[in-house]
Amino acid sequence: MEYNTSELCDMYLDVVDVVEPMFSNYGGCSSFGGSISTIKCFEDNGLITDVLQEDGQGKVLLVDGGGSLRRALIDGTIAELAVSNNWEGIIVYGSVRDVDALEELDIGIQALASIPVGADGNSVGEVDIPVNFGGVTFLPGDHIYADNTGIILSPEPLDIE
């Protein structure tokens, strides 16, 4: 489904939180949204791989990677896993790699930057907890909408019809 965050802000500005503009699009889908699952990890993507093995229909994985630009939390293999399990998108407060492969995949991916160095895979971190970055607190189950213009968050799904 296509989302236009500008139009959604015009209709729901009193309901949504707007994430500070710092993200770039790396996936093949420039517009995506859904109910969020959260992960907090630092330079380690083991938990990301674990969570993306679950059915992601209607969900967006939101990763608080501490804003690290030193290690990529998402790569082509992890993104392919997300696609195969029907995730709508991934938002990473951190870095990605394999950007040419990511842009070919049918999934939305936004991150701060790209870097060729991969992350550790020790599964260190926390899942389904509140996380805060970009001036917004994200709670598991909140609804997120993203496009090339920005990212917005709502406690309930927005009526976009």
UniProtKB/Swiss-Prot annotation:
One GO cellular component term: cytoplasm
Domain of life: Bacteria
Keyword line: Cytoplasm
Pfam family, one: RraA-like
Molecular function, one GO term: enzyme binding
GO BP, sorted A to Z: regulation of RNA metabolic process
Subcellular locations according to the entry: Cytoplasm
UniProt signal peptide: none
Keyword Membrane: no
SUPFAM superfamilies: RraA-like
InterPro entries: RraA, RraA/RraA-like, RraA/RraA-like_sf, RraA_gpbac
Quaternary structure and interacting proteins, as annotated: Homotrimer. Binds to both RNA-binding sites in the C-terminal region of Rne and to RhlB.
NCBIfam families: NOT-MenG (TIGR01935), PRK09372.1 (NF006875), RraA_entero (TIGR02998)
Entry function: Globally modulates RNA abundance by binding to RNase E (Rne) and regulating its endonucleolytic activity. Can modulate Rne action in a substrate-dependent manner by altering the composition of the degradosome. Modulates RNA-binding and helicase activities of the degradosome.
Family named by the database record: Belongs to the RraA family.
UniProt-recorded name of the protein: Regulator of ribonuclease activity A
Species of provenance: Shewanella oneidensis (strain ATCC 700550 / JCM 31522 / CIP 106686 / LMG 19005 / NCIMB 14063 / MR-1)
Gene name tied to this protein: rraA
